[in-house]
Curated annotation (Swiss-Prot):
<dbReference type="InterPro" id="IPR017958">
    <property type="entry name" value="Gln-tRNA_amidoTrfase_suB_CS"/>
</dbReference>
<dbReference type="GO" id="GO:0070681">
    <property type="term" value="P:glutaminyl-tRNAGln biosynthesis via transamidation"/>
</dbReference>
<protein>
    <recommendedName>
        <fullName>Aspartyl/glutamyl-tRNA(Asn/Gln) amidotransferase subunit B</fullName>
        <ecNumber>6.3.5.-</ecNumber>
    </recommendedName>
</protein>
<dbReference type="InterPro" id="IPR017959">
    <property type="entry name" value="Asn/Gln-tRNA_amidoTrfase_suB/E"/>
</dbReference>
<keyword id="KW-0648">Protein biosynthesis</keyword>
<keyword id="KW-0547">Nucleotide-binding</keyword>
<comment type="subunit">
    <text>Heterotrimer of A, B and C subunits.</text>
</comment>
<dbReference type="Pfam" id="PF02934">
    <property type="entry name" value="GatB_N"/>
</dbReference>
<dbReference type="InterPro" id="IPR014746">
    <property type="entry name" value="Gln_synth/guanido_kin_cat_dom"/>
</dbReference>
<dbReference type="Pfam" id="PF02637">
    <property type="entry name" value="GatB_Yqey"/>
</dbReference>
<keyword id="KW-0067">ATP-binding</keyword>
<dbReference type="GO" id="GO:0050567">
    <property type="term" value="F:glutaminyl-tRNA synthase (glutamine-hydrolyzing) activity"/>
</dbReference>
<dbReference type="InterPro" id="IPR003789">
    <property type="entry name" value="Asn/Gln_tRNA_amidoTrase-B-like"/>
</dbReference>
<dbReference type="InterPro" id="IPR023168">
    <property type="entry name" value="GatB_Yqey_C_2"/>
</dbReference>
<dbReference type="InterPro" id="IPR042114">
    <property type="entry name" value="GatB_C_1"/>
</dbReference>
<comment type="similarity">
    <text>Belongs to the GatB/GatE family. GatB subfamily.</text>
</comment>
<dbReference type="InterPro" id="IPR018027">
    <property type="entry name" value="Asn/Gln_amidotransferase"/>
</dbReference>
Amino acid sequence: MEFESVIGLEVHAELLTNTKIYCGCTTEFGGKPNTHVCPVCLGLPGSLPQLNKRVLELGIKAGLALNCKITKVGRMDRKNYFYPDCPKNYQITQDELPICRDGYIDIELESGEVKRIGIERIHIEEDAGKLLHTKRGTLVDFNRAGVPLIEVVSKPDIRTPEEATLYLTKLRSILSSAQISDCKMEEGSLRCDGNISIRERGTEPFGIRSEIKNMNSFKALEKALNYEFDRQVEAVTNGEALSVETRRWDETNNKTIVMRSKEQANDYRYFPEGDLVTLNVSDEWIEEIRKTIPELPYQKADRFVKEYGLPKYDAHVLTLTDAMADYFDECAKLSGDPKAASNWIMGDISRLMKEESTWVEDLKFSPKELAELIEVIKDGTISSAIGKKVLEDMFAEGKSPKTIIDEKGLKQNNDEDAIRQLVNKVLDENPQVIEQYKSGRTRILGFAVGQVMKETKGQANPGIVNKLVTEEVEKR
């Protein structure tokens, strides 16, 4: 029997607001424990929430960016549960009337096929506090309590861990590019839970699902889903009964561990939040918000393919971050050579950034100066080999290409008479070049070219050197 996985993701993203969802406390990351708090986010008696309009705006913006229908009349609800990091013993969230429904994200599979992953709903809610487990006991920090979130719930359309990674990668790029969330997984501003079950391939009914928590990176997401698929297949194959449960990914031991049996919706006793008014969203406001959505990464990638003729892979890599996409876009326009701009950014510049653990935002030279480097190589001022050395100096010092070329005397030698003299010198010192060439081993010319380039410290024009080496060998 062959099994397939059925996967749905629940993604929490902290919203880019200055203050919390129901009070005026800062949402700034960090700070001393329990200093970004007030009676409202601590749930003290007599305190009343007031919804931050910016939270609703960003929730609608997320829905529009993810092709959702926007709920015109909605409400907030109480989700009741008892846990130390939940100061009110309930969370103000949305149950029956989420702000957005029925969206989708298209992902491109390795085969080139485009697959649509449905989005069931997006709702706004408040974050909980944070528990810190120490040898002396468990401490609670309420700085995060009340920080606004959206939860993006996908439909169970994902079939492999690889598809899950593609979906989450694209979701993160959209939310980040649209300035909805900074999506920093390392700071907890993007968190992902996965629901996975198995079924016989080709059948419709869903199996018994497990919810997986603590998947704090893309690598952890794939490893956890792969492990859980194998665990469930092994259990079913051995005749064991699966149960609905919540499990967590143990990064140290590379396995999922049972936390508790999975709660059902009625366990939370949802009911409308009486301290907040009904949410009314007008068509005019929706259109105002729509106008604030910038060109999204996948739209940029499509434009780079159509406008610049880039391969899909290059366009995808260049749009992984807004900063890289914008840097390339400007350089491509200024240089008039998008492919060269793409090659430099994806090649040597990416290598240098990786070696120094820096980002495009940290580059000391502008797109205009990279375009200048492309131009001086194209017009023969320097060779491509020298261009790589110039780029390294630009990366380290932030000087313009022309300044570096002038200071170091790197201009390419295009003097045919001078180069011809060097060619003859190399051929005189290496008579085997002539012998081997005349016996049919034409590759030996590459050796002669290399020797001439060595004599000129790479500054001779390679095209001229190649031409003159061939001419002089033919004469002898």
